[in-house]
Design a protein with these regions (language model features):
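Terminal low-complexity tails and localization/encapsulation signals of metabolic enzymes
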Residues: 1-3, 248-261
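Conserved CoA-thioester-binding segment of acyl-CoA-metabolizing enzymes
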Residues: 1-55, 92
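Terminal peptide-recognition signature
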Residues: 17, 21, 36, 54, ...
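Hydrophobic alpha-helical membrane-association signature
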Residues: 32-35, 83-86, 189, 230
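Crotonase-fold acyl-CoA enzyme core
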Residues: 92-208, 235-240, 244-248, 254
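Glycine- (often His-adjacent) and acidic-residue-rich active-site loop
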Residues: 56-93, 109, 221-222
Length: 261
């Protein structure tokens, strides 16, 4: 399917999703969010796709937040609540997906753009990128899951600083507090990100899926409850042909040929 505001480009087992509104720094309006929701659903259902990379068009912005004109048009608290819930549900598709997603942050990742990145499994960034949640400077707060995901990823102290000041942070600062996983020079961002992707793709597909599930579910549980989930996922992995192939390949000192079953 073709879209108006996003591009979806398959590269083997990888799908690269680009928010394509460079004239407005790839701002997220309702149509763009709807297109992302459709694309995320389609990619989750596509057995040929094993990893999703998300980025923004151009070299200035990843996604510079929500569309201000749409925010201004809100007439009531219920309008705002509906908008926030809609964005939360779009981003939750990434958070709950069985496939890993990587936000490839090539420029400003602000507000809703930062929140979209936080919903991804991993985040890579250009060393020149700026990241933040500046909503309080507009008299509102993050509404697409930012207050919750940032606290879980980087801790409540970092979340309070980012949300309450509304400051923008360098990619280096975001990396230091754990928001960004890997930093690259701008000209090396795509290659470096895809190298991470292909490392993940070389691992056991079932094991990757089960590991994502164990981490996602365990975050909201006690240590003891999380370890029960972990042992469940470990048990499932141990019954797969991939596990037998991985063990055999290790003992035979060869590269494993995983089949995803």
């Amino acid at each position: 399917m073709s879209y108006e505001n996003i591009l979806v480009e398959p590269e083997g087992a990888v799908a690269i999703v680009t928010v394509n509104r460079p004239k407005v720094m790839n701002a997220l309006n309702a149509k763009t969010l709807s297109e992302l929701a459709h694309a995320f659903d389609a990619l989750e259902a596509d057995a040929n796709v094993r990893c999703i990379v998300i980025t923004g068009a151009g070299d200035k912005a990843f996604i510079a937040g929500a569309d201000i004109n749409e925010l201004k048009a809100m007439q009531s608290a219920m309008d705002a609540k509906r908008l926030a819930y809609f964005g939360q549900q779009v981003f939750a598709r990434l958070d709950r997906a069985s496939k890993p997603s990587i936000a490839m942050i090539n420029g400003f990742a602000l507000g809703g753009g930062c929140e979209l990145a936080l919903a991804c499994t991993l985040r890579t960034a250009s060393k020149t990128a700026k990241i933040g949640l500046p909503e309080v400077s507009l008299g509102i707060i993050p509404g697409y899951g930012g207050t919750q995901r940032l606290a879980r990823i980087a801790g409540p102290g970092v979340a309070r600083e980012w949300v309450l000041t509304g400051d923008l942070f360098t990619a280096e600062e975001a990396h230091r507090v754990g928001v960004v996983n890997r930093l690259f020079a701008p000209e090396e961002l795509r290659e470096g990100t895809l190298k991470i992707v292909h490392t993940i793709l070389s691992r056991g597909p079932v094991a990757v899926r089960l590991a994502i599930e164990a981490i996602r579910r365990g975050i909201n549980m006690s240590q003891q409850e999380g370890e029960i989930i972990e042992s469940d996922m470990f048990g499932l992995a141990s019954t797969t042909a991939d596990m037998r192939e991985g063990m055999a390949a290790f003992l035979e000192k060869r590269k494993a040929d995983f089949q995803g079953r």
